[in-house]
């Protein structure tokens, strides 16, 4: 059993809060202390939202979970918070699959797709570091992706099974080895790595699952622990002497032997009932398949205490009733903690959509005898469950979504940029001769060594425009949905370094596109109402020019839509607030000088697996099948638009056009 130690949060920064940051910090902190459940920080681009969040955490002093909508963004936040809080525990918790293909079954072609997952060791270590930190001290900030609402083992079991070693403790060597095996550590005297231990005479060396290079050397004298030291596992260098060390389990799905026996009995009982059901329905192939697969897993559990895909039996292993809420990272926090949701207008819809997508895939596996019905309980939280488990939330967004607006009585605004930078000037120009006009504007920026972003409505237009610009001698690249995360980051870096002067794309709202060198953002077809030109996405796009003191936006349009009017008025309002502040304090706007943070190497992963449209269109279809496909795509498109994933929505819209044209 470990005791949680108390440490205050300490910010390391050369800056003090300024502009309207102090007011925003004060309002949010007072709201939290008064027990407010929902608060929203409406922070314009470049106003230092991360710094405000850090100051709120410091003032409130609670363990905090910060949820971002993908691994890349979580990685950027992790780097920033680690810089602000070097003395505190800043942790990182994302899905640990480098490449993850969940198991699935396609009935029409009778294809079973095995789970194919290569676990990324670095991320696995960081996940263990995050969960163990919560049981060791209270100054913990965990940056997580939405995967934090997926099932995890029972936190009480995880905490109770900690192997605690203390100098002077009575314990013989074989007892320690037995305890380590119970918590899923394996003995390996040759290939010493995380989650293993090795034995040399009276010395046991343990490589904790939560550490990167540090192992623990426990020296025995008879039946007593004589000495505990932290050692670098590669060099063998002794780092420091320890009086005490807590070794957390090597797996989050660890179960005591007596509980495992009960779990196995429960699984056998469920298997028996399900086989009867399938045979009564004359589903003999499915029954045979289920019997074979489940019995193999049970055999592995009896022998090894573990099996591949053990998470599918989590409801039995944690002895929960069927259909009950799964344990997640949220349960590892105590009673008094804080949740911050970054880019909440994108992250919350993701949290909301996780359960349904997961359920649909697993239901097919259950129906066809690949899994027991209880596998449906290894799932992400439903949105209502997420709401139940979280006590106090701060939503952070430049354009809060409907949920935040509905649940927050008063927005905490952060409009003023400490740098004095103004929101960009916006000009609306007619579409006639727009491309020639655009080229001359680009030329002006190139001469000043500045960069340009151009956003279009369709993939074809992006491609044609890029080709046209290349022929005109402009250094341009096209950012589209097929580009993988790593390449995407490289293209943005190349833009900053001047390899390119222009980037063309459909959705330039995704992470990492806050580029100070960009002085011009061009919005083509600004008057075409739709999800790509809604007031929220227009404001976000305009914000991309707000990090440069010469920032301008040109909208090409032949009429003024409501969305355009709202975005232009809101930008002007923010511009005036900033101008007054600058005048009062004698601030001259200056372009941000922003260094590029190193991301955790492991964050540059297959985010793109989730970017592509899920719907595959078969070549030949009946009229009925075609209509069903159209309905499905329409549904998916609306969801993607709601989630601000406009590239995916556009791809789906193009599919719809094709289908309707063929019909």
UniProtKB/Swiss-Prot annotation:
Disulfide bonds: none annotated. HAMAP family: UvrB. SMART domains: DEXDc, HELICc. PROSITE patterns: HELICASE_ATP_BIND_1, HELICASE_CTER, UVR. One of its GO terms (molecular function) is excinuclease ABC activity. This is UvrABC system protein B. SUPFAM superfamilies: C-terminal UvrC-binding domain of UvrB, P-loop containing nucleoside triphosphate hydrolases. It is found in: Cytoplasm. ATP binds at residues 43-50. Residues 434-600 form the Helicase C-terminal domain. The lineage of its organism: Bacteria, Bacillati, Bacillota, Bacilli, Bacillales. GO terms for biological process: nucleotide-excision repair; SOS response. Forms a heterotetramer with UvrA during the search for lesions. Interacts with UvrC in an incision complex. The keyword NADP does not apply. Residues 30-417 form the Helicase ATP-binding domain. Keywords: ATP-binding, Cytoplasm, DNA damage, DNA excision, DNA repair, Excision nuclease, Nucleotide-binding, SOS response. It comes from the Bacteria. The gene is uvrB. Residues 627-662 form the UVR domain. The UvrABC repair system catalyzes the recognition and processing of DNA lesions. A damage recognition complex composed of 2 UvrA and 2 UvrB subunits scans DNA for abnormalities. Upon binding of the UvrA(2)B(2) complex to a putative damaged site, the DNA wraps around one UvrB monomer. DNA wrap is dependent on ATP binding by UvrB and probably causes local melting of the DNA helix, facilitating insertion of UvrB beta-hairpin between the DNA strands. Then UvrB probes one DNA strand for the presence of a lesion. GO terms for cellular component: cytoplasm; excinuclease repair complex. The beta-hairpin motif is involved in DNA binding. It comes from Staphylococcus aureus (strain COL). Belongs to the UvrB family. The keyword RNA-binding does not apply. A motif (Beta-hairpin) lies at residues 96-119.
């Amino acid at each position: 059993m470990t005791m949680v130690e108390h440490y205050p949060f300490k910010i390391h920064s050369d800056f003090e809060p300024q502009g309207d940051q102090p007011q925003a910090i004060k309002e949010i902190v007072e709201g939290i202390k008064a027990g407010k459940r929902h608060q929203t920080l409406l922070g314009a681009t470049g106003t230092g939202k991360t710094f405000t969040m850090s100051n709120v955490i410091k003032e409130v002093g609670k363990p905090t979970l910060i949820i971002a909508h993908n691994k890349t963004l979580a990685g950027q936040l992790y780097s920033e918070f680690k810089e602000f809080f070097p003395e505190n525990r800043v942790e990182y918790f994302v899905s640990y699959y480098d490449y993850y293909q969940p198991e699935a079954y396609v009935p029409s072609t009778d294809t079973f797709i095995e789970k194919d997952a290569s676990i990324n060791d670095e991320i696995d270590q960081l996940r263990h570091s995050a969960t163990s930190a919560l049981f060791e001290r209270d100054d913990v900030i965990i940056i997580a992706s939405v995967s934090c609402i997926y099932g995890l083992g029972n936190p009480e079991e995880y905490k109770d099974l900690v192997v605690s070693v203390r100098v002077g403790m009575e314990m013989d060597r074989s007892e320690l080895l037995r305890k380590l095996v119970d918590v899923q550590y394996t003995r390996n005297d040759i290939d010493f790595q995380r989650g293993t231990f090795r034995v040399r005479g009276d010395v046991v060396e343990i490589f904790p699952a939560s550490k990167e290079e540090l192992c623990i050397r426990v020296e025995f004298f008879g039946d007593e622990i004589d000495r505990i030291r932290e050692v670098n596992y590669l060099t063998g260098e002794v780092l420091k002497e320890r009086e005490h060390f807590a070794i957390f389990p090597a797996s989050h799905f660890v179960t005591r032997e007596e509980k495992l026996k009960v779990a196995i009995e429960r699984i056998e009982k469920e298997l028996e009932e399900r086989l009867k059901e399938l045979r009564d329905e004359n589903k003999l192939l499915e029954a045979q398949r289920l019997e074979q697969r489940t019995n193999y897993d049970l055999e592995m559990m009896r022998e090894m205490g573990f099996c591949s895909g053990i998470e599918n039996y989590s409801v039995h292993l944690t002895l929960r009733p069927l259909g009950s809420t799964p344990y997640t990272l949220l349960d590892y926090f105590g009673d008094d903690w804080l949740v911050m949701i970054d880019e909440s207008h994108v992250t919350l819809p993701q949290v909301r959509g996780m359960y349904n997508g997961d359920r649909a895939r697993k239901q097919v596996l259950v129906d066809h005898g690949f899994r027991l019905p209880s596998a449906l309980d290894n799932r992400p939280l439903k949105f209502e469950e997420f709401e139940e488990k979280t006590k106090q939330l701060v939503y952070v967004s430049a354009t809060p979504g409907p949920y935040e607006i509905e649940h927050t009585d008063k927005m905490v605004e952060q409009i003023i940029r400490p740098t004095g930078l103004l929101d960009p000037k916006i000009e609306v120009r007619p579409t006639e001769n727009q491309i020639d006009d655009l080229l001359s504007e680009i030329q002006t920026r190139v001469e000043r060594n500045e960069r340009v972003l151009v956003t279009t409505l369709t993939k074809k237009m992006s491609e044609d425009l890029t080709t046209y610009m290349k022929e005109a001698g402009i250094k341009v690249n096209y950012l589209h949905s097929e580009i993988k995360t790593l390449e995407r980051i490289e293209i943005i870096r190349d833009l900053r370094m001047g390899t390119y002067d222009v980037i063309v794309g459909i959705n330039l709202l995704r992470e990492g596109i806050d580029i100070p060198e960009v002085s011009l953002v061009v919005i083509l077809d600004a008057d075409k109402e739709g999800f790509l030109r809604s007031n929220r996405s227009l404001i976000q796009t305009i914000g991309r020019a707000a990090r440069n003191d010469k920032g301008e936006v040109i909208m090409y349009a032949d009429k003024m839509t409501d969305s355009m009017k709202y975005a232009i008025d809101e930008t002007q309002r923010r511009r005036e607030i900033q101008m007054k502040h600058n005048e009062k304090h004698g601030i001259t706007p200056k372009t941000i000088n922003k260094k590029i943070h190193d991301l955790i190497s492991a964050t540059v992963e297959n985010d793109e697996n989730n970017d592509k449209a899920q719907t595959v269109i078969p070549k030949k279809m009946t009229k009925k099948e075609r209509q069903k496909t159209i309905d499905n795509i329409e549904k998916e498109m609306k969801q993607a638009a709601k989630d601000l994933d406009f590239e995916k929505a556009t791809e789906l819209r193009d599919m719809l056009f094709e289908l309707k044209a063929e019909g």
